[in-house]
Design a protein with these regions (language model features):
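Active-site anion-handling motifs in enzyme catalytic cores
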Residues: 1-338
Length: 338
């Protein structure tokens, strides 16, 4: 009997670190599941924020197919973004295959295009990034909305009530949103993360213990100062919660994606790149859903004010259907690289 050796699939920028970010956990779960049902299993991954060249060079260079989860890393020439592109170059230099998927691409150095010009599959999560990457590489680049929205969620309830207020990558926005949550009994403060502080996989030993103690102290203080706040354990709990709300107010792209996936109306405060604005443009939603922290203080946030229009709902449903189909094609094509 002839044995068939499976190709070695390696992922870099694995953003599911202990389930901390619910949307990130969902993206990585979708990547794993979609590869698995096509007979491809991930043999190893490099966590977000880690330089693969430090301790994972052997793993990355053993890949037959390297999957780079671009996420929000590839903007403004970030050092961590360059690490991902250098991984692509290393694997392509060995004659193996690389797929860069689910990527933001914004305001990057001119030479970055050279680093991915030979990558087998290029796929961005917003049309602005597609245009920028096409200009940088001269290549065809696919567009699929964030992978967190590419697979169906549990059935959405027919009735909704209450307002969920989230957090932001910016501490001042998180603080302002927490203050906003005290303005009404209808408001509940629920971040889209399992805890207040992220524990980087870079931290080990004494540094990790100290960071853990600090994070625990900060979270206890946050909960004491914000009686309406609670942290959920996982993605399923968050999806169940947000799908029952009449409005989500957030400063995170993560929470906007999950609001759209569950057809929950939202208002968003601008983040650290164009990702939320681009998502609103791509779907065709009311641009007034995007606001600044200053304007949010004067915004009518009453239930029903931000319900989706018939056109918005139709646009969401059309995009989710298209992205589901396009994601299936994407993973079929990744499997075909084997």
């Amino acid at each position: 009997m002839i044995s068939v050796t499976k190709p070695r699939i390696v992922v870099v920028n694995d953003t599911d670190v202990n389930g901390y970010h619910f949307r990130c956990a969902r993206v990585m779960s979708i990547i794993r599941n979609q590869l698995s049902i096509r007979g491809l299993d991930i043999v190893g991954s490099v966590a977000v924020s880690l330089n693969w060249q430090d301790a994972n060079a052997k793993l990355v260079n053993s890949a037959d197919i390297l999957v780079i989860n671009g996420e929000g890393t590839l903007h403004h020439g970030s050092r961590k973004g360059r690490w991902l592109l250098e991984a692509a170059q290393s694997v392509k230099g060995r004659g193996r295959s690389v797929a860069l998927i689910n990527a933001l691409w914004q305001n990057n150095p001119a030479d970055w295009g050279d680093l991915i010009r030979d990558v087998d599959i290029l796929c961005c999560r917003d049309s602005r990034s597609v245009s920028a990457m096409v200009e940088a590489t001269g290549r065809d680049v696919r567009f699929i909305g964030d992978l967190s929205m590419s697979q169906p969620v549990p059935q959405v309830p027919s009735t909704r009530s209450g307002v969920v207020i989230g957090d932001s990558v910016h501490a001042n926005v998180t603080a302002a949103l927490a203050k906003l949550a005290t303005k009404s009994n209808e408001f509940e403060l629920v971040p889209v993360t399992s805890s207040l502080k992220f524990l980087s996989p870079n931290l080990t030993g004494l540094r990790r213990k100290l960071r853990t103690a600090y994070a625990t102290m900060k979270q206890k203080r946050f909960l004491a100062q914000n009686p309406s706040a609670r942290f959920l354990a996982n993605e399923d709990e968050y999806l169940s919660m947000v799908s029952k709300k009449s409005l989500s107010i957030t400063g995170r792209f993560h929470a906007v994606c999950l609001a759209i996936a569950t057809q929950t109306p939202f208002v968003a405060v601008t983040s650290n790149s164009w990702k939320i604005e681009a998502l609103i443009e791509d779907i065709g939603l009311n641009t007034e859903r995007m606001t600044t922290l200053t304007d949010l203080a004067n915004t009518d946030l009453s239930e029903g004010r931000w319900d989706y229009s018939a056109d918005e709902l139709a646009n969401i449903e059309a995009c989710l259907t298209d992205w589901h189909s396009a994601a299936n094609t994407l993973f079929d094509d990744i499997a075909a690289l084997a």
